[in-house]
């Protein structure tokens, strides 16, 4: 239901429609040998971009990331030619339980699981993937923060200079929750 509300076409493998549906969430896709079966394989722009590991409502998602990461690394060869890959794996990894959703963006400099409140729309993942392909050295906001040029000291008061410096250092060190 959350996927449908976000604009995804949720379907079985035989019902996938890459032509008329922009974002497809395909149920129960068998991954490469030893990588199991992904609950959902996500497609945008006719390309595989991510996986979802779905758990029963109320299940804690702590410790589930290894499973969805295994799916992201196990995309079958037949899908790889057109897939969006980062370090030989799908970049967008989700775990969901109906009450909480975790998300990992593989394009981030130090990818890690983050709690999100809603599934992103297909257009959002497509934009992130396009931005990453267009600028591989700084594919995401977090990567661009790491590469910020030093700010000119302009005409700031001393306390403002300290505050701006502290904010930039915090962002660069990823000391933020979103």
Give, region by region, the residue ranges found by the protein language model:
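ATP-dependent helicase/translocase motor core
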Residues: 1-178
């Amino acid at each position: 239901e959350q996927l449908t509300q976000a604009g995804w076409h949720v379907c079985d493998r035989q019902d996938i429609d890459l032509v008329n549906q922009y974002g497809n969430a395909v149920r129960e896709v068998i991954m490469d040998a030893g990588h199991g079966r992904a609950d959902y394989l996500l497609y945008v722009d006719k390309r595989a971009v991510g996986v979802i590991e779905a758990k029963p409502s109320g299940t804690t998602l702590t410790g589930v990331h290894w499973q969805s990461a295994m799916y992201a690394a196990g995309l079958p060869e037949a899908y790889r030619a057109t897939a969006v890959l980062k370090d030989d794996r799908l970049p967008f990894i989700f775990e969901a339980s109906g009450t909480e959703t975790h998300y990992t963006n593989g394009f981030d400099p130090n990818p890690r699981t983050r709690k999100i409140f809603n599934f992103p729309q297909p257009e959002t993942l497509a934009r992130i993937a396009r931005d990453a392909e267009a600028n591989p050295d700084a594919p995401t906001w977090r990567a661009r923060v790491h590469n910020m040029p030093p700010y000119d000291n302009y005409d700031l008061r001393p306390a403002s200079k300290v505050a701006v410096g502290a904010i930039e250092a915090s962002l660069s060190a990823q000391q933020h929750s979103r």
